[in-house]
């Protein structure tokens, strides 16, 4: 299994030099988020991830979760690692101090989440889903619900889930069959079956708090009739003491391609006691608070697994001896040269490096927007941050997982035949990453959300909010002595972005299928241009540091070389996506269903 080491130098480069986290924390009044606090989270968090979680990654995949008559047991070592997580207070880093959290900015929580996901993504899903459930309760629950649930979930002694999918519906939640019948005491009896429920049952915590979508007896049809309920595994009393077992049980666990140490459960609700969150028939709105949290977390999985794969691939490429360099021996004292000297291996490694480091910048920028949305005292600034978040969330989820899958595949390819063998660990990263393109809304759905709802639905407002940032950067750096070529390339694509949007919008006025036909290519085009914006920002900082005579010349030179690779080798992929967007819907919709022959 590749040995994971947190990429602390690259993380600190973005935190301190590109995005100035400390300056932003001061502006937002986050006085506790000092440089020393950031350093402590990075240093202690990396030790926990490298020394405790990473060693459990392969064994967890090999063993998987065990199911026995409704009881789910996590792999060996998971429970002990979770106890250390609880003892360290890691689950509450960015949680509300009113409920026992440390109250630090969301961006600091993301740093920890990155290291957890890269060291053991399956383990990380248990506390990760809990934080998502907490966000929904915090935003929409009553004060009594917050008081009862949040402190225990913040501590980690209770965990959380979200229960949406049913056997007959995943994306189309408007046709769910789970029902909520009012009880005399104000609670509801929840009946139905949910599937694909991550962390639905396990042995890590004393209670599990399920957030369940269901319909009331008089609910309107479709998504306008969905309500959200808290359904605890054990019914707590008013003081939070765990009481009687609720009528919710795990019917089975799934046998999956990857993330095998994360329990994916079929959950049966047989008249279970549930408590309404928010208003009746407004459950989807409440759940999307959690879903947006989960989508950003899922995007991070692409980065996390890509980082671990890259680290393994680089080490292997430096050590594996095969053939001689085309330009002559580079290690004449050895029987062959290390494969890292070969151009195609370089292509793979640079692709991995460029996507990982670009995606990390995108993730950290997005995390800063979360900080602004939650902490800024300026209403207009909060609104701008919320708009940018709405626009970037589907890009983060879909583009980061699409490129993350490419990166893990390339990592396996660098190993050649050994990459296909389980004991090396590279194929596990491919398997674990694959689900990220599917759950929390498939990438096709993210593409529809981006183009249909976020861009066209806002009459272009959300797109303009981001392209304005790109335009301002390009305008300011148009005459940069070393980087003006990359600036011009980005400026041209930024303009084309608006033109493509207008073309699709006009075509969709005559045929709604034009949106669906263009959406995935539109999202990928958007992702490549978005990463180019961040790579330009990275390159500008690196160039400035080199010009100032930095003592870390090799680090900054590598940034410039990787930026050049991105602009010259990866960004041109936008041309293919633009051509596909302009091809329109006709080529996709001309065949009848019967003409898809078997």
Label the predicted regions.
Residues 1-124, 148, 579, 583-598:
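Amphipathic, small/basic residue-rich leader segments at the start of a protein or domain
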Residues 2-5, 259, 365, 387-465, ...:
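Alpha-helix capping/hinge segments and adjacent helical runs
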Residues 25, 30-32, 62-74, 286-297, ...:
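Glycine-rich cofactor-pocket loops
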Residues 65, 78, 126-130, 141-183, ...:
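Internal maturation/activation junctions in enzymes
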Residues 111, 457, 473-598:
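C-terminal amphipathic alpha-helical interaction region
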Residues 131-133, 142-145, 442, 450-494:
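A structural-propensity feature for long, helix-poor, extended segments
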Residues 187, 191-245:
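A short core secondary-structure module
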Residues 196, 235-251, 256, 263-294, ...:
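A glycine-rich, basic-preceded beta-loop-alpha segment at the flavin cofactor/substrate interface
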